[in-house]
Amino acid sequence: MVKTLVLVRHGVSERGSEDMSRELTRAGQRALSANYPHIFGLLGPEGEEAEIWTSPALRALETAEIVAEALDAEGLEIHDSLYDQDLPALQAELEHADAETLILVGHAPFLGYVAETLLGFELPLTKGAVCAIDVRGSLGHQHECVWKQLGGVREPHGKLLWLVSGPSTQPWETLDALDEACAHAATNLEDAYAEFRAHPEDPAVISAFRFALRGTQLLTKFFSPLLNEEAVKIAEPVYRLMLGATTRLREIDGFSDTVADLMESGELSQGSKLVSAVEAARENERDRVCEALRKKAVRRSLRCALDELFEPAWSDAVLKDGISFEDVSSRFDYMLETIDARLFGLDMTSFSEVHHARREVREVEHILFHLSDMLGEKRANYTQIMQDIDSELSTVCTAQRNISLVKEWKDSMDFRDVTSDLAIVSEHEKVLIERVIEGRETSILR
């Protein structure tokens, strides 16, 4: 004989598909999985022997499976009456039920009507909500009378034991968005790495590879307080290795771009041998980079890092409670405030300070690139501001690196015939730095 009837409305589901095949959203699944062990723990020992009846609709079946997992129960019974909202059929089935605790997983408004009929008052059964009703009847009423109430008897004989509203899916929707951002970053890096291995001679390819690499590194850094510590330890070394291995190649490409600009402006002659000398230096560096990044150990480490991005290992606290939008937005806002403080009064003559500031600006750029939809239009508007600041800082960084390369190459046998052209490049870059310093803005938040 049923003593306790538990009514469960299915969790938040997808929209737009055929009704029977609508699934729970991933956020809906996560919200139920995180909350149901505690909620169904309210049943105490009685929950261990509970029977679970469910509507055949997929969203209800998925909810019932999460209930079963929370109770460590086996087997579900499908009852069409719960989907058809067939009260006489359900009443007949209840009269023959044997379990002392029976759980019904179904839909609104039907479950709400069942609860109201048994209790005499309306219950707010939100999606994922659970209520437990003592259906043994009040003093002087037989058990059978309780089920007859469902057929129209007005006197309510059930007693509400407890009601828990459906859990909010917002923290899990945020987590889903972060999962998607991580997967998008992983796909970008995977594709960029494959393209680099196929076409290492193309400067645009190496630039795209480094952009994807830096993006995944900075996204991992941004999420690091939310991730399992081991996941961060797996990813960071390979990102650092690959960025370090490709840095000089990118610097040579930047120098090559400067030489091309100076030839176009006429500051360097069209027949300058500096072009071929730089190309030779790039070929040597490209071969070194290709050899380093094609090693099996490096590829295996990258694969592990990508796997961590495709399936992020969130911390136990995140898996338990999800992530609020405020967790993400406040962290981003703190980044902006930190960068504004650094840019105000920045010493543009200090290579280390400019380089560090540019890295922080690019961190914001990459976070906006991956999370702009989540962060909203107001924060997304900083994208152009960051790009403008990045352009100025990059101009200075590239010029400073070009000057450093000139100092290195002017004593090299490979550049012995182009020292005068190297001097032209160096002088041009010094003038460029001075111009940027004279015209720069000091704060991004003005």
PLM feature segments, named:
Residues 146-170:
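Short, solvent-exposed aromatic-acidic interface loops
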Residues 11, 57-61, 108-109, 127, ...:
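Alpha-helix N-cap/helix-start capping motif
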Residues 165-446:
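Function-determining surface determinants
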Residues 105, 113, 129-130:
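Active-site histidine-anchored catalytic micro-motif
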Residues 121-144, 148-155:
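Domain-level recognition of soluble alpha/beta enzyme cores
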Residues 2-80, 122-125:
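Active-site-proximal alpha-helix that buttresses catalytic centers in soluble enzyme cores
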Residues 81-94:
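Short alpha-helix plus adjacent loop in nuclease-associated cores
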